[in-house]
Amino acid sequence: MEEKNMKKATIRDVAKAAGVSQSTVSRVLNNNGYVGEDARRRVEEAMEALHYSPSAIAVCLSKSRSRMIGVIVPQIFAPFFSRMYYIADRIMERYGYRLLLCNSDESLKREKELIDDLLSYKIAALLIVPVDGDEGSNKAYLDQIRSTGTPVVCVDREIEGIHCDGVYIDNYTACYEVTKDVLARGYRNIAYMADPPIYRPGCDRLRGFRDACKEFGVTVPQENIFLAPIEDTKPLNAFLHDVARRDVPPKAIINFVRGWDY
């Protein structure tokens, strides 16, 4: 009867079964360097007989670059970042890459630790939504990583003065144009919902909204402005229910809470 907890075969076991050195097995695994046809056949047969599969981490460490891309987001539960990861994963899969997803939890210290962990796996590139708040940012460190040859792409949050590549949204113009369009249609009693202005995207949206209102001479009461914590939908739902029960509810609601569809 086969044991339930069979010992996993190692590269040493394969080498012994094939009658070759461990370095020969390594060359077969990495397809690097000369290996005779007979030796290669024996190694492959030994791997099959022993059900040997190399550790993904060991393979990464044996190469100068892995086929893995590190991804760091600040709030893994936020729908916007989940969708971003999903799309990136589908695209990178076409090119033979796998993604390693990490959550910085909006912590500058944790973000740097995660970057170091990912670099230890010799990632091919880093895709990051950087922390950039009151604590500052890891701008200098990200630039340093880029200068050593690891591609770094910042997404969503643009850090001023950073030299890494980036994919950003013009949040100011988007919110300004949407608000301007609503006001141009004659709406004056309006409400605004968006992420809190803690990070640059939220700040830019709020600025765009206020500039459009100012241009049309419209003052929106504070009770009609809700800056939603995206990790909890309860306050946002409460705001919407409150708005709906008013004697004179807003005629239009401008929603820039990323990821939440109402």
For each predicted feature, which ranges?
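Interdomain hinge and pocket-entrance segments immediately C-terminal to HTH DNA-binding domains
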Residues: 54, 63-77, 95-97
